[in-house]
A protein has these predicted regions:
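Alpha-helical and His/Cys-centered functional microenvironments
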Residues: 6, 16-17, 53
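Bacterial N-terminal signal peptides that target proteins for export
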Residues: 14-29
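Classic N-terminal secretory signal peptides
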Residues: 32-33
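A generic "folded-domain core" signal
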Residues: 41-186
Length: 186
């Protein structure tokens, strides 16, 4: 029979931080599903957490959708309400979509603006629509995903509809394991 474990004050604080992270992720799941514009028959399920990246799945009309998602470690400028900010990479085998990176902001992006993602000095340009952004040149999606797997941190710069320049820093710890987890998504 397993022994009971007791949480120290630090463990309780870690648990509160984890619960806050899970609540933010739950919000992200709802946003991801809403952004697909597809009715679904099943709520998203968290498959597993890998450091700063979680792996998730849900059933959609076109089949199973799997994705990895993280929230930024740092947000700038500090004096503005950013809302819920996420970066995710989705895979939709039923629609022949593999590893599609997407930035989701908690605010509308400036029309016709670009979002710049930088990893280890390499820049990727994303086009915007509403509060989301996708890789401008789909042929660069695999290169962005490879850079994420090989990098330590990722910077995402955007401009809000109001003209506020924003910058987010994401940890890439766990991205490779999370992507490996959804590789078998069918």
């Amino acid at each position: 029979m397993p022994c009971p474990s007791f949480r120290s004050g630090t463990d309780q604080q870690d648990n509160r931080q984890e619960n806050m992270f899970v609540r933010k992720i739950a919000t992200a799941l709802a946003l991801v599903i809403a952004s697909t514009g597809v009715a679904f028959s099943q709520s998203p399920t968290r498959i597993q957490q890998f450091n700063d990246w979680g792996a998730y799945s849900y059933q959609a009309g076109g089949g199973k959708v799997c994705y990895v998602l993280s929230i930024p470690k740092e947000k700038a400028p500090s004096g503005v309400d950013h809302g819920d900010i996420f970066f995710l990479v989705s895979q939709r085998p039923g629609q022949n979509i593999s590893y599609e990176p997407q930035a989701m902001m908690g605010y509308p992006l400036q029309e016709n603006s670009k979002v710049n993602v930088t990893i280890d000095g390499r820049n990727f340009v994303l086009f915007t629509k509403g509060n989301s952004a996708w890789v401008e040149n789909a042929a660069e999606e695999p290169a962005l995903v490879a850079a994420m797997k090989g990098g330590k941190a990722m910077s995402v710069k955007a401009i809000s509809r109001r003209g506020t320049e924003t910058n987010y820093t994401y940890s890439l710890a766990g991205i490779t394991a999370a992507l490996n987890q959804i590789e078998t998504c069918k």
